[in-house]
């Protein structure tokens, strides 16, 4: 070991250990450059975040525009469908009205103005003239044929004697047997002949009388009819519209000033959610003596609702894609005591 405390083999060197333990101190320039790089990275990150937010906002705007375009397309499709249904209803009413008039019009009548199909009375007149001789011929044939069927045919003398001979050997007069058989079968057949001939004469007279009607008499004959006939003729011209909950919105009531959707009631009927015959408020008051129940609103049956839809569609005043306001169409009679709150 020398004076400095160092060993010759180099194991113990205090000065060398002091050099390794010293840390490298960066300069001020290096610190400033590192801070500047960090600030630049932060700015780039903030720019990227702002660009991302702008892209998300543009995407949301595109989504909104797409949704509005889809809604407009759906509205256009619904308007087109409603217009097509209205046109179809009118075409069907124009087609069915002349057919109803043709079926209900006797000879010589005049169809109201505005109907495309006209009735030709001379063709019906020719058809009746052609039909009358057939009836008269059939009547004469029945008169000629029926009495022969009613009177018994006289069989040969030998056959009557053989069939009329009793087993004990008694002789029976063949004239008496034929007369008794005729007496047994004759009156009923004669009645039948008279009845059929009278029916044929009635048919002929009915055709003649209907043929001899003038225009005024025929118009009077049309006006004289039962109320059910008039009602059936009116209903033939109307198109029966059936409510379809998949394509048509439920009806509403605007008695409170706000459109309130109605409740389903019965078989296709509807019940008001905001009015009774004496009260108009929403919601209707609850019953104190009945749990989960309110005062019953005004009602409309399913058949009445379908008739209302048919009338509105025939008049063309209402678009079936919009809900029907039942404010002025409710039934005049009373309602049930309560409705269940759902």
UniProtKB/Swiss-Prot annotation:
Stretches of the chain forming a coiled coil according to its record: 41-67
GO biological process terms, semicolon-separated: response to ethylene
Organism of provenance: Arabidopsis thaliana
Subunit details: Homodimer. Heterodimer with BPC4.
Location of the region described as Disordered in the Swiss-Prot/TrEMBL record: 143-199
Chief site of localization: nucleus
Any one annotated GO CC term: nucleus
Protein name: Protein BASIC PENTACYSTEINE6
Composition bias, Basic residues: 185-194
Biological role: Transcriptional regulator that specifically binds to GA-rich elements (GAGA-repeats) present in regulatory sequences of genes involved in developmental processes.
Entries under PANTHER family matching the protein: PROTEIN BASIC PENTACYSTEINE3 (PTHR31421), PROTEIN BASIC PENTACYSTEINE6 (PTHR31421:SF2)
Localization: Nucleus; Nucleus, Nucleolus
Gene name for this UniProt entry: BPC6
Signal sequence region: none
Taxonomy, superkingdom: Eukaryota
GO molecular function: DNA binding; protein homodimerization activity; transcription cis-regulatory region binding
Domain text: Alanine-zipper domain is involved in homo- or hetero-dimerization via electrostatic interaction.
Alphabetical list of Pfam families matching this protein: GAGA_bind
Region spans: Required for nucleus and nucleolus localization: 164-195
Tissue-level expression: Expressed in seedlings, leaves and pistils. Detected in the base of flowers and tips of carpels, in sepal vasculature, in young rosette, in the lateral and tip of primary roots, and in ovule at the exception of the outer integument.
Transcription regulation is among the record's keywords: yes
């Amino acid at each position: 070991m020398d004076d400095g405390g160092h060993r010759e083999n180099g194991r113990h060197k205090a000065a060398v250990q002091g050099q390794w333990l010293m840390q490298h101190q960066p300069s001020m320039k290096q610190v400033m450059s590192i801070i500047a790089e960090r600030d630049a990275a932060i700015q780039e990150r903030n720019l990227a975040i702002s660009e991302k937010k702008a892209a998300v906002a543009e995407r949301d705007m595109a989504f909104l525009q797409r949704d509005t375009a889809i809604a407009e397309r759906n509205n256009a499709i619904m308007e087109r469908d409603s217009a097509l249904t209205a046109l179809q209803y009118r075409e069907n009413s124009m087609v069915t009205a002349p057919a109803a008039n043709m079926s209900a019009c006797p000879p010589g009548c005049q169809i109201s103005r505005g109907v495309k199909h006209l009735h030709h009375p001379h063709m019906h007149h020719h058809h009746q003239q052609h039909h009358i001789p057939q009836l008269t011929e059939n009547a004469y044939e029945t008169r000629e044929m029926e009495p022969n069927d009613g009177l018994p045919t006289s069989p040969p003398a030998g056959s009557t004697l053989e069939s009329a001979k009793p087993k004990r050997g008694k002789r029976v007069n063949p004239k008496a047997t034929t007369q008794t058989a005729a007496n047994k079968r004759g009156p009923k057949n004669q009645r039948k002949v008279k009845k059929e001939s009278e029916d044929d004469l009635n048919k002929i007279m009915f055709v003649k009388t209907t043929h001899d009607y003038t225009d005024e008499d025929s118009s009077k004959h049309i006006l004289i009819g039962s109320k059910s006939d008039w009602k059936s003729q009116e209903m033939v011209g109307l198109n029966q519209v059936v409510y379809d909950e998949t394509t048509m919105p439920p009806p509403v009531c605007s008695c409170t000033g706000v459109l309130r959707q109605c409740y389903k009631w019965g078989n296709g009927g509807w019940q008001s959610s905001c009015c009774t015959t004496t009260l108009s408020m929403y919601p209707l008051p609850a019953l104190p003596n009945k749990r989960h129940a309110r005062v019953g609103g005004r009602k409309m049956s399913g058949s009445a609702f379908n008739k209302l839809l048919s009338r509105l569609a025939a008049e063309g005043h209402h678009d079936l894609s919009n809900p029907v306001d039942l404010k002025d169409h409710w039934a005049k009679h009373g309602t049930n005591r309560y409705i269940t709150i759902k």
